[in-house]
């Protein structure tokens, strides 16, 4: 029978927030828990499941890094923690006294341990705070992760290093962020500007 080639699916570019929009979200989060949550998702490029799975033992303040255990693809990785984030996490721990998971829900599990913050709870926090910040883009947890990768590339971090920090198996996945990066050498300009710059002296 006649075999027809499959029609390639349209690939949508990731939604990315500006640094100013990230700042607005941090400023709009009233609860310390939510500020730290957003700071970790964006500041470490975490998936929703990864931020929910953070345990106190995964935080290494001396080495300024977070151990992400068994993330997607079953590969552990380490990501750096900023000094600002470390201060916020310490304040949060001091105020909330979590025992196992960094972010907990309102119920205990069968063994009496703190239950993890629910996926719905994380997404609700991110979406409601983005709206409060006046951001018109459709913001989800992965939007903050996309923004992390894009901003690192714009800051000149090597793409292979970004791949490692994101936990991507294939560098091609990381390269998708190049389509939304505003790299200095890639900014489009009119050739007329070059003519004036060279010839109007």
What would you call each of these model-derived segments?
Residues 1-201:
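Conserved catalytic core of the tyrosine transesterase superfamily
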């Amino acid at each position: 029978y006649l075999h027809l080639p499959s029609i390639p699916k349209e690939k949508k570019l990731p939604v990315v927030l500006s640094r100013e929009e990230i700042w607005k979200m941090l400023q709009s989060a009233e609860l310390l828990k939510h500020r730290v949550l957003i700071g970790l998702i964006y500041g470490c490029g975490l998936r929703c499941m990864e931020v929910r799975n953070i345990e106190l033992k995964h935080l290494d303040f001396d080495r300024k890094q977070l151990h992400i255990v068994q993330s997607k693809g079953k590969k552990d990785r380490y990501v750096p923690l900023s000094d600002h984030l470390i201060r916020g996490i310490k304040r949060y721990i001091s105020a909330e006294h979590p025992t196992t998971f960094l972010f907990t829900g309102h119920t205990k599990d069968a063994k009496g341990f703190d239950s993890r913050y629910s996926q719905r709870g994380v997404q609700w926090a991110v979406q409601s705070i983005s709206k409060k910040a006046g951001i018109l883009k459709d913001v989800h947890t992965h939007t903050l992760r996309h923004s992390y990768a894009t901003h690192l590339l714009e800051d000149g971090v090597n793409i292979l290093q970004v791949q490692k920090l994101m936990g991507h198996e294939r560098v091609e996945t990381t390269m998708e962020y190049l389509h939304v990066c505003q790299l200095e050498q890639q900014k489009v300009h009119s050739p007329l500007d070059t003519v004036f710059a060279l010839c109007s002296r």
